[in-house]
């Protein structure tokens, strides 16, 4: 299968750049799965999104993202976000506590991290 170049960039750092076979996330219009040669589009991510990047012969990347945008061309996916954490960087207890916050932005960030950990749909 042809590869899709993916770049995930947060305000503070370039999180990941590489080739993938499939990208999944949630936008304000609904869930989206992107394969190589996808039609071009721009979409806004939901505040509590998780991005899953599938790579040939490697484990999937699961990344919690805080808001942002997704840009798709036939050859590439670019995801620009406020904040992001790899699954391996997430403190599950802190994410759970944040998800129960009265502050909606904090709660959304907690839910995004729980999704990346596979603890929330």
From Swiss-Prot:
One of its GO terms (cellular component) is proton-transporting ATP synthase complex. Keywords: ATP synthesis, Cell membrane, CF(1), Hydrogen ion transport, Ion transport, Membrane, Transport. It is a peripheral membrane protein. GO terms for molecular function: ATP binding; proton-transporting ATP synthase activity, rotational mechanism. It holds the Pfam family ATP-synt_DE_N. Transmembrane segments: none annotated. It comes from the Bacteria. It is found in: Cell membrane. Belongs to the ATPase epsilon chain family. Produces ATP from ADP in the presence of a proton gradient across the membrane. NCBIfam families: ATP_synt_epsi, PRK13442.1. F-type ATPases have 2 components, CF(1) - the catalytic core - and CF(0) - the membrane proton channel. CF(1) has five subunits: alpha(3), beta(3), gamma(1), delta(1), epsilon(1). CF(0) has three main subunits: a, b and c. This is ATP synthase epsilon chain. It comes from Mycolicibacterium gilvum (strain PYR-GCK).
């Amino acid at each position: 299968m042809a590869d899709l170049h993916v770049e995930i960039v947060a305000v503070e750092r370039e999180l990941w750049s590489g080739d993938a076979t499939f990208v999944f996330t949630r936008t304000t219009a609904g869930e989206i799965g992107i394969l190589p040669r996808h039609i071009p589009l721009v979409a806004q991510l939901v505040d509590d999104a998780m991005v899953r990047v599938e790579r040939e012969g490697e484990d999937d990347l699961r990344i919690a993202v805080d808001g942002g945008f997704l840009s798709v061309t036939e050859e590439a996916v670019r995801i620009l976000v406020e904040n992001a954490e790899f699954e391996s960087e997430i403190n599950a207890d802190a994410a759970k506590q944040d998800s129960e916050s009265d502050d909606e932005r904090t709660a959304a960030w907690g839910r995004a991290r729980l999704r990346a950990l596979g603890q929330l749909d």
